[in-house]
Design a protein with these regions (language model features):
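An alpha-helical, amphipathic repeat domain used for nucleic-acid recognition
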Residues: 1-171
């Protein structure tokens, strides 16, 4: 199936998008959604062909599906690695969930990653909250003279980090 009327234009567009995809994959480890968005943006800004967006998105989907079949892109591994990285940074499980959703990861992969984290660690949210406190020098790591003064501010920082009120009080 050839979505464009001119076969040489179609082949040229496909090869240029494949080249862009491979060069992007050399630099970064993206999810499927991130790669699709990147290729579409590059097409709209740099290539600017005569084919419609619908035809281009079909070509991009085909390229991404090919890469997934070749196991060059794997959203499950991406989800696991990002979830572990976010946990090391001090993200709460809620914030990890939200960040992965924004990156276009499927819900089943997100749930699997969070379950793996829960199996590995005892109270991952509490550990992450302590890491956040250490990084921002808030809560128990703030000088004792200033703790009561900055209590509300510290609670707000933890709440914006995705931690529950009870957990924030415990920290």
């Amino acid at each position: 199936m050839n979505p464009t009327s001119n076969k040489s234009d179609f082949e040229e567009l496909t090869t240029s998008l494949k080249d862009l995809a491979y060069s992007y994959l050399e630099k970064y480890s993206p999810s499927k959604q991130q790669l699709k968005v990147f290729l579409l943006k590059k097409y709209l800004t740099k290539i600017k062909g005569t084919t419609s967006k619908k035809e281009v998105s079909l070509i991009i989907d085909e390229i991404v599906n090919n890469l997934e079949k070749k196991r060059i892109i794997n959203d499950e591994l991406y989800s696991d690695s990002k979830a572990r990285m976010f946990l090391k940074r001090g993200y709460s499980l809620n914030k990890i969930n939200q960040s992965l959703r924004i990156k276009g990861i499927e819900d089943k992969f997100i749930k699997q990653s969070i379950e793996k984290i829960k199996e590995d660690k005892i109270e991952p949210d509490f550990v992450s909250a302590l890491k956040l406190c250490k990084r921002r020098r808030i809560g128990p790591l703030r000088p004792t003279a200033n703790r009561e003064i900055f209590y509300k501010k510290d609670m707000g920082i933890l709440a914006r980090g995705g931690f529950s009120f009870e957990l924030s009080k415990r920290v």
